């Protein structure tokens, strides 16, 4: 953001007086962020140049508790083109901003509503980043969220593995520990091996991200971030599922956290780019048809 935006936004954020939601996904457009119904056209009001926004957003997590929404809208160009999308910081109390249906999910309840924009006006100063280059702002956001998700999923996966090992050593059906059975050992060996390899890749990628500018990350590390993300999110689902199996009935119950871990982390295989999108990103770098 600009120096003026930093002065306006950062202090109240640090004081807990301001929060932002992320408005990229639309009801008719999920993974393909370059197609969107939301548009913004130039309009001057009371001598102040700005933009009039119309459209819709979905999965705007955090509403109604946040004060602003990072709203991505097409300002020029054709659908399917990355160029021509702009990010606007829109106050949630702006006339024409309407919170609609709240979406219940597998794990997280009701703070994911639809939003409708009807002639919502914002000044030019509400543009975050460069005009027509809003997807670069979105990329910065999702790269950081993807590596965060990967670390979170790895930690939860390791917990599930550790608890399954502990229980398998303690539980003694038919007079001997579950742990002596290779049907228990081998799946946990594979899960632990994957966890160890992922840990190194996540640490390496996160350290490299810290040493680069955000544009450099997008250019040089995007594929590594995607590798971390989709593999870790798959791992935690597999680890939680097997931990349930090792624990039997009590593992499936809410007296153990495995079902909650599964429900919570299963969404990570869809949010911040579905795992198929992550794999497509890796393939693009691998085969040289995507930067």
PLM regions and their residue ranges:
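A short, Trp-centered hydrophobic/proline-enriched beta-strand micro-motif
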Residues: 16-24
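Active-site-adjacent elements of ketosynthase-type condensing enzymes
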Residues: 28-37
């Amino acid at each position: 953001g600009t120096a003026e935006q930093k002065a306006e936004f950062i202090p109240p954020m640090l004081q807990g007086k301001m929060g932002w939601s992320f408005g990229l996904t639309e009801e008719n457009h999920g993974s393909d962020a370059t197609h969107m119904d939301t548009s913004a056209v130039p309009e001057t009001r009371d001598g102040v140049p700005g933009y009039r926004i119309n459209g819709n957003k979905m999965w705007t997590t955090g509403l109604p508790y946040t004060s602003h929404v990072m709203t991505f809208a097409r300002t020029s160009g054709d659908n399917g083109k990355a160029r021509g999308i702009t990010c606007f910081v829109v106050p949630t109390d702006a006339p024409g901003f309407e919170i609609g249906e709240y979406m219940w999910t597998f794990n997280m309840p009701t703070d994911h509503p639809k939003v409708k924009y009807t002639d919502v006006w914002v000044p030019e100063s509400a543009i975050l980043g460069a005009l027509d280059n809003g997807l670069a702002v979105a990329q910065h956001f999702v790269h950081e969220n993807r590596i965060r998700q990967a670390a979170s999923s790895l930690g939860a996966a390791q917990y599930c593995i550790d608890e399954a090992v502990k229980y398998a050593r303690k539980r003694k059906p038919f007079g001997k520990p579950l742990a002596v059975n290779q049907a228990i050992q081998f799946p946990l060996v594979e899960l632990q091996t994957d966890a160890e390899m992922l840990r190194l890749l996540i640490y390496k990628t996160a350290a490299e991200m810290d040493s680069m500018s955000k544009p450099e990350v997008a250019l040089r590390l995007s594929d590594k971030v995607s590798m971390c993300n989709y593999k870790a999110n798959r791992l935690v689902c597999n680890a939680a599922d097997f931990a349930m199996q090792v624990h039997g009935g009590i593992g499936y119950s809410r007296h153990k956290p495995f079902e909650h871990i599964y429900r919570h982390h299963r969404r990570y295989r869809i949010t911040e780019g579905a795992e198929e999108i992550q794999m497509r990103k890796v393939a693009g770098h691998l085969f040289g048809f995507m930067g």
